[in-house]
Design a protein with these regions (language model features):
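A short, proline-enriched helix->beta-strand linker immediately N-terminal to the Walker B motif
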Residues: 156-160
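Short coil-to-helix segment of the ABC ATPase nucleotide-binding domain corresponding to the Q-loop/switch region
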Residues: 97-105
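Helix-to-loop junction immediately C-terminal to a conserved catalytic motif
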Residues: 52
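Conserved ABC ATPase signature
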Residues: 137-141, 145
Length: 359
């Protein structure tokens, strides 16, 4: 387990001291994938450097299994660095070395005997699906292949922690998914704690267990993916599962933003809401997605016929939570919608496909 306690990091410049990290507190469970996201300048890279011990924090602690790594120096620090494998945004492979030689580099630096090193390199390249590229040079590889070599090298010393610093940035969708699947697999097989530094919310949603949002050097939100998406007030939740809602049509009283809470939700909840309360419901947009064993869902609906408080209370009984929606009246800008029955085949709904209105 990794514990980051009241971490501060400042730099001296010609114009004075700049504080980049301002009291970071995080707990990263063993075997979990934790994403750290935020805009440029939020402090993500600085935090990753402090975790990987490339830089010492100005104050605060980085504890791994209870040991304060930020207080170490010399041989003790070098020894603990081996417990942290890092995958960089650009693979940082040495272009004059073959793939096998690049993976072997940390083993050679540690003084591992040749035969053992060869076996370990072959094992790692086989694990990332590149054993057939052992004699190739980095210039002969695709971007995704280079990152897989980077993962193999990061795993060479059998780390307990894997730090991925924007490792999928700039990759095509297929290569990105291959890297994410590989990270998920090695996490499970090796029991690693994975820290995923990224700005891509699709990446976070597909692979992370929990997410920390950095803003201006502080943690603004932190929690499991499902909990954030289920919280209508969470900005991170809205970014993780965005909904592009259509305007509220004429004849509807108000809009609601609806989120799935933890636990099962009837896929026919729109029908149940309409028939149970006798209200008209317009589906303005939404998205439903599986995340492990959890179903994430968010929707924007328009309602007519009952007070908002009554509708919100009924939605809670269905395992949903609602807040005032973002849709605005479109009476002056859109034609009235033709009422149709909501989906009743259990298929749920897809964002931006159609508007379902029930009476």
């Amino acid at each position: 387990m990794i514990e980051i306690r009241n971490l501060h990091k400042s730099y001296s410049t010609g114009q004075g001291t700049v504080e980049v990290l301002k009291g970071i507190d995080l707990t990263i469970e063993q075997g979990a994938i934790t994403a750290v996201v935020g805009p440029s300048g939020a402090g993500k890279t600085t935090l990753s450097h402090c975790i990987s011990l490339l830089e010492k924090p100005t104050s605060g602690q980085v504890l791994v299994d209870g040991r304060n790594l930020s207080a170490l120096s010399g041989q003790a620090l070098r020894s603990e660095r081996r417990a942290i494998g890092t995958i960089f945004q650009h693979s940082a492979l040495l272009r004059r070395m073959t793939v096998a030689e690049n993976v072997a580099l940390p083993l050679r630096n540690l003084g591992v005997v040749h035969r053992e090193m060869e076996d370990r390199v072959a094992e790692l390249l086989d694990r990332v699906g590149l054993l057939h590229k052992a004699s190739a040079y980095p210039g002969q590889l695709s971007g995704g292949q280079k990152q897989r070599v980077g993962i193999a090298r990061a795993l060479a010393l059998r780390p307990r922690i894997l730090l991925s610093d924007e490792s999928t940035s700039g990759l095509d969708p297929e290569s990105t998914q291959q890297i994410l699947d590989l990270l998920d697999d090695v996490r499970t097989e090796m029991g690693l704690s994975v820290i995923l530094i990224t700005h891509e919310m699709d990446v976070v949603r597909h692979v992370a267990d929990q997410v920390a949002v950095l803003a201006n050097g502080r943690v603004s939100e932190y929690g499991p993916i499902g909990a954030l998406v289920a919280d209508p007030g969470s900005g991170a939740g809205r970014q993780l599962l965005p909904v592009r809602a259509l305007p509220l049509p004429a004849g509807f009283d108000y809009a609601l933003s609806v989120s799935y809470r933890h636990g099962p939700v009837d896929p026919e909840w729109l029908t149940r809401l309409s028939t149970g309360l006798g209200v008209r419901v317009a589906l303005l947009g939404g998205s439903v997605e599986a995340h492990g064993e959890t179903v994430l869902g968010r929707a924007e609906i328009g309602v007519a016929g009952r007070p908002e408080a009554e509708v919100r209370g009924y939605l809670e009984q269905l395992g949903l939570v609602a807040d005032p929606g973002a849709a605005v009246s479109a009476a002056a800008t859109a034609s009235p919608l033709t009422p149709t029955a909501p989906p009743s085949d259990g298929a749920g709904f897809e964002a931006n496909e159609k508007i379902g209105v029930s009476a």
